[in-house]
């Protein structure tokens, strides 16, 4: 049988993971406060201030050895450069989507991630899929097709978020680095370009810093904390709970985002969108039930 974590440790881990996903679910409220700032500039700030925050944590933990090792090999740099590009693309589309009135579609992207991860496991890692998993992926594909036919457009925001985050997750799975060191490497590789862009924005008088209210500037400077804190919670929780538990908790974020989109931001959610979501949710239910049954069979 798979060993169970100590009850107290598992409880703390579950709480940390739940807080992480709740944080990610509520974060559209934060980004909406920054809607007046250019999305590309926001991502540049996010890269720079995430690096500052993460480096401070690494310095506190004396974790320089792993960071130097990751930056010292050509393969390590290449792998992390690709993951950096995927992560930055994901951030950019997400922030733009939230601030352009597409919170519901952003939530759809993250509902698709577990099913896309399963598909990537089959196509990239050659993992065998159970029949229920294939049906679940098929349900998601039907949901996307319904969106295309009934709504009249492909949900490109959702698909881009799912593909970039799914691809990023795959690369992180192949990487030996922990979440914190991985984020440090990824931001280190792109922060110089981001910093140069921010300096250019400031020089032209278009940058947010020095040209906006004190509250807005404080929110911009806090992008690093907003990025790194949930990752620290995730890293703490993931080490202390089962992967299946973590998989169930991941639905918190898109569920909260969806709820915000419908209630707080009052975005349109018509019957055609409801039908598309219904197919995807059905796939997720099937996927989750199948995983739980498989876990019981393995640990019996």
Predicted region positions:
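Glycine-/small-residue-enriched transmembrane alpha-helix faces in small-molecule transporters
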Residues: 1-41, 138, 142-174, 196, ...
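C-terminal-most transmembrane helix of multi-pass membrane proteins
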Residues: 2-4, 251-300
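Loop-to-transmembrane-helix transition segments
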Residues: 12-20, 64-93, 156-160, 208-229, ...
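Structural motif at transmembrane-helix junctions in multi-pass transporters
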Residues: 36-41, 92-109, 232-249, 268
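Transmembrane alpha-helices of multi-pass small-molecule transport proteins
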Residues: 38-89, 116, 164, 185-201
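Hydrophobic transmembrane alpha-helices of multi-pass small-molecule transport proteins
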Residues: 54, 129-148, 159-163, 272-291
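C-terminal transmembrane-helix exit sites in multi-pass transporters
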Residues: 96, 112-132, 255-274
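Helix-helix packing/entry segments at the starts of transmembrane helices
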Residues: 108-112, 177-189, 228-263
